[in-house]
Design a protein with these regions (language model features):
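N-terminal pre-catalytic "stem/leader" segment of glycosyltransferase-like enzymes
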Residues: 1-115
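Short, conserved loop/helix-junction motifs that constitute active-site signature segments
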Residues: 110-116, 161-164, 182-184, 208-210, ...
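Generic beta-sheet signal
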Residues: 122-124, 171, 191, 246
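Acceptor-binding helix/loop patch of EC 2.4 sugar-transfer enzymes
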Residues: 123-153
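Nucleotide-activated donor-binding/catalytic signature segment of Leloir-type glycosyltransferases, i.e.
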Residues: 241-255
Length: 255
């Protein structure tokens, strides 16, 4: 009952019906249209968030929810109609677009149909060849050390997003930039990771309440790639320290 009331507080009847239709639809997309706008943009990212813009519990599950909203707002504020489609579904969109923004594989699918469009790749990870190599290196290390046979998790499907793009917005640092081939680097603009830090934090209060021997690991899938096993090894050797692990933990590390 509490969950139902929380939904009713976040959604009008119209918004709730739109969300239900979206959930039931096979084609996961959101369309923003104003008759006076003549240009169209395609966003390959997260469409569901546009049906849940006032649901803070949903928005706070990952910073990429608000990132998707901001993309749409930028296009709307600059006189564009736009379509947002799930980045990992198979797009059958045949509309002609002026700008294409987002993640593979749909970024690549739609970019190849719109060669004259401005194509902006929104890169959330390192260059795919580097990432796949690091998955292999870290997993092989773990398997050798623990005499096990963990498969490779979090590998990235080979793609030509970076080559197709006119520009690349890359979340990360100079290290991330250096994972790309030299020929691609001039296209890249580094941007900071966004955050869901929406409440004011009192440093004074934190200093009064935190414990110097307790630490927090907060992460999603791909535990080996992120090095959780190395962190656990350290804490096993330092029993005076306490580690709280939150998030999706791959079974191989959990064991």
């Amino acid at each position: 009952m509490k969950y139902i009331f929380s939904i009713l507080r976040c959604y009008s009847l119209t918004e709730l019906m739109s969300l239900i239709i979206f959930k039931l639809s096979k084609r996961k997309r959101y369309v923003y249209y104003k008759k006076e706008n003549t240009k169209w943009a395609y966003i390959s990212y997260l469409p569901e968030v546009f049906f849940r813009q006032h649901d803070d519990n949903y928005l706070n599950t990952h910073q990429n929810k608000r990132e998707s909203l901001v993309m749409g707002q930028v296009f709307a504020n600059n006189g564009f109609n736009f379509v947002v489609e799930s980045f990992d579904t198979v797009s059958v969109d045949n509309r002609r677009y002026d700008i294409i923004l987002g993640l593979e594989p749909n970024f690549c699918n739609v970019a190849k149909k719109n060669l004259d469009a401005l194509k902006i790749y929104y890169a959330t990870g390192a260059y795919y060849k580097h990432q796949n190599l690091m998955v292999k290196v870290r997993t092989d290390y773990f398997n050798t050390k623990h005499s096990c046979h963990v498969p490779y998790y979090r590998t990235v499907i080979e793609n030509d997003a970076a080559d197709l793009a006119d520009f690349i917005f890359q979340i990360g640092s100079k290290y991330t930039l250096d994972t790309y081939p030299n020929r691609i680097r001039p296209k890249i603009s580094l941007i900071d990771q966004s955050s869901n830090l929406y409440k004011k934090i009192s440093i004074e209060q934190k200093l009064k309440t935190y414990r110097r021997n307790e630490f927090l690991w907060l992460g999603g899938g791909g535990s080996l790639l992120k090095g959780l096993d190395l962190v656990l090894d350290y804490f096993c050797q330092h029993r005076e320290l306490i580690l709280h692990v939150l998030g999706n933990i791959n079974q191989e590390v959990n064991d």
